[in-house]
């Protein structure tokens, strides 16, 4: 699985330009889960991450390369108890998985399953608002959660715990960034991940290898492994017929 490897390398190169704090990973101390999405009124909120005119983004990358030995939570910028006002925000997840094999349909299914995890994490007092079209993500933090000691280590552990429930996931790296220059620099990679997602959907909805007339040809040409996945799926369809 090489689809996201170039983006992962570029992301980490950008992240490492900043002061990166490696937070402890203690799944037993993950933040309590609300069980479902909650709505926080403005009057009950301490502040927002990525709110107002502040930039925000999220994206998830998958790799079978051995890039970490254990789960990781990385932070660029202040931790939640240190924040007093609205700040920029990015949350990036990198998943190291088992070998997903050569079956393109199985690879696609596994990627989609892992992507959907982010819609099922509900830290109490941590209200997430997504925009899948623009890759934006804003978070509203409740005064009560802040009073009880919510932190990125606890929230990151909640995400890791949920991702580890997905089949094939070996290790999870969750990166939180709260510096405007860092968030802005990563926006192009969020766009590239979105392009890959749209291209995968297009491939599996239109299993034809007529690359010359495909709107997604640019992405297939640029992303290592995408064209092989598409052609492999087309051959599999031909064999069935």
Label every PLM stretch briefly.
Residues 1-22, 30, 34:
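Ordered core of a single globular domain
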Residues 15-18, 167-170, 193:
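Short, flexible helical or helix-coil boundary motifs
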Residues 27-31, 35, 105-111, 136-140, ...:
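Extended non-catalytic scaffold regions that mediate assembly and binding
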Residues 187-232:
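Cysteine-cluster motifs in flexible loop/terminal segments that predominantly coordinate metals
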Residues 31-171:
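Long, charged N-terminal interaction/targeting segments
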Residues 179-181, 237-241:
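Short Fe-S-cluster ligation motifs
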Residues 172-191:
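Long amphipathic alpha-helical scaffold segments
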């Amino acid at each position: 699985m090489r689809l996201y490897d170039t983006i992962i390398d570029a992301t980490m190169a950008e992240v490492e330009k900043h002061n990166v704090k490696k937070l402890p990973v203690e799944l037993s101390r993950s933040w309590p889960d609300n069980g479902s999405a909650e709505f926080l009124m403005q009057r009950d909120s301490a502040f927002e991450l990525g709110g107002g005119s502040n930039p925000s983004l999220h994206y998830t990358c998958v790799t079978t390369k051995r890039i970490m030995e254990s789960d990781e939570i990385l932070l660029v910028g202040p931790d939640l108890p240190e924040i007093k006002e609205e700040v920029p925000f990015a949350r990036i997840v990198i998943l190291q998985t088992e070998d997903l094999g050569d079956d393109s349909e199985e690879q696609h299914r596994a990627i989609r399953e892992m992507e959907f995890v982010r819609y099922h994490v509900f830290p109490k007092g941590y209200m997430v608002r997504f925009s899948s079209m623009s890759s934006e993500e804003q978070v509203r933090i409740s005064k009560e959660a802040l009073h009880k000691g919510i932190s990125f280590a606890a929230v990151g552990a909640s995400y890791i715990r949920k991702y580890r429930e997905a089949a094939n996931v070996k290790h999870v790296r969750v990166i939180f960034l709260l510096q405007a220059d860092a968030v802005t620099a990563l926006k192009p990679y969020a766009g590239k991940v979105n392009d890959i997602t749209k291209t995968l959907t297009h491939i599996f909805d239109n299993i034809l290898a007529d690359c010359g007339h495909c709107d997604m040809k640019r992405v297939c040409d640029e992303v290592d492994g995408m064209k092989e996945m598409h052609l492999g799926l087309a051959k599999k369809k031909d064999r069935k017929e």
